[in-house]
């Protein structure tokens, strides 16, 4: 090999390495989706995001990803603390995520999309902690609402709307919840499943507000949907459970029990434990309306012991069990249920109910 040829090859290799290893070549955004958790790499332009989808330039080819399929987005300029916090949030380790986020000053973050993520995760984590372990719900709602109103084109928009609705319910502001769950919030999402989820959430909020006729209508709308996929069908089953509870609350507990027993008989607890938690809670409430405290206790106990993955349903079960154990002569068990409720779900509205 001649000296000139060798020199040319070396120069070419160095130039190639410089391109490959340069920050501009290495710095890429990554969209992680439900179908490709390894990530889709490219560059998201400043105007590449809406509440419904995110566009990314992948080697000259622009692809669009629906927001409801996105697990998370990692940006090229992410601070390491944000990378950790984002992963911790996905894993629902909110306390550790909060610790990481506390190290980041949003004012020092230059890229707007990264700054949006910092602001969102700071507010979202505080909201989740306020709803579960405790904290100032009003402050958490205020912080998240600032993000919600300032960044309506963020792909986090609908998640923020749902969480704000949950916070509103937790502080008894059902009027505010209606807005967050409604057409300007979660219910305005372009995906049918999100609309069903919004209707279900609104129905549950109306139950807590004592507006059982309105709640029943909300549940009927969801249950009567023509959507037919696994997620939609699951949401419709949950709506039927809500409808059954409304029957009990409006003087028809026998009808409610028949519907709920049918739900339990026809579904698999291994596939949807949360449905069974809601169903057994609703059965418990039906039995309470029939003045059958022992039957009610056994229903709520099933949620506590077998179907506790739905934190809201579990909190309700513990709240009802605390009273029922006392009423059935087991004050020690009542104290145990009350303590468990306060330790695990001090942020839940059920923890403050008398």
List the predicted regions and their residue ranges.
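Residue signature of alpha-solenoid helical repeat architecture, marking inter-repeat boundaries
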Residues: 75, 113-117, 155, 193-195, ...
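TPR/TPR-like (Sel1-like) alpha-helical repeat modules
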Residues: 298-305, 319-349
């Amino acid at each position: 090999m001649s000296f000139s040829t060798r020199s040319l090859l070396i120069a070419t290799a160095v130039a190639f390495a410089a391109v490959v290893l340069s920050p501009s070549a290495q710095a890429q955004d990554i969209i992680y989706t439900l179908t490709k958790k390894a990530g889709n790499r490219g560059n998201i332009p400043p105007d590449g995001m809406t509440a419904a989808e995110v566009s990314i330039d992948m080697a000259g080819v622009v692809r669009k990803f629906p927001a409801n399929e996105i697990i998370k987005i990692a940006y090229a300029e992410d601070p390491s603390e944000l990378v950790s916090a984002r992963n911790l949030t996905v894993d629902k380790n909110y306390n550790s995520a909060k610790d990481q986020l506390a190290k980041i000053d949003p004012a020092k973050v230059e890229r707007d999309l990264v700054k949006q993520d910092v602001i969102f995760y700071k507010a979202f984590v505080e909201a989740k902690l306020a709803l579960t372990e405790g904290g100032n719900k009003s402050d958490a709602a205020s912080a998240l609402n600032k993000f919600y109103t300032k960044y309506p084109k963020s792909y986090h928009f609908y998640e923020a709307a749902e969480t704000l609705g949950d916070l509103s319910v937790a502080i008894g502001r059902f009027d505010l919840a209606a807005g967050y769950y409604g057409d300007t919030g979660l219910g305005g999402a372009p995906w049918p499943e999100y609309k069903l989820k919004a209707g279900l959430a609104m129905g549950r909020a109306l139950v807590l507000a004592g507006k059982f006729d309105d709640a029943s209508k909300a549940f009927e709308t969801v249950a009567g949907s023509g959507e037919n996929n696994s997620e939609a069908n699951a949401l419709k089953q949950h709506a039927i459970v809500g409808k059954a509870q409304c029957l009990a609350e409006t003087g028809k507990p026998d009808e409610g029990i028949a519907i709920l027993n049918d739900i339990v008989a026809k579904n698999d607890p291994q596939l949807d434990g949360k449905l069974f938690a809601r169903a057994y809670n609703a059965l418990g409430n039906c039995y309470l309306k029939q003045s059958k405290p022992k039957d009610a206790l056994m229903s709520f106990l099933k949620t506590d012991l077998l179907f506790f993955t739905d934190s809201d349903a579990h909190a309700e079960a513990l709240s009802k069990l605390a009273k029922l154990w006392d009423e059935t002569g087991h004050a020690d068990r009542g104290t145990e249920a009350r303590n468990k409720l306060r330790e695990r779900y001090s942020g839940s509205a059920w923890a403050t109910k008398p």
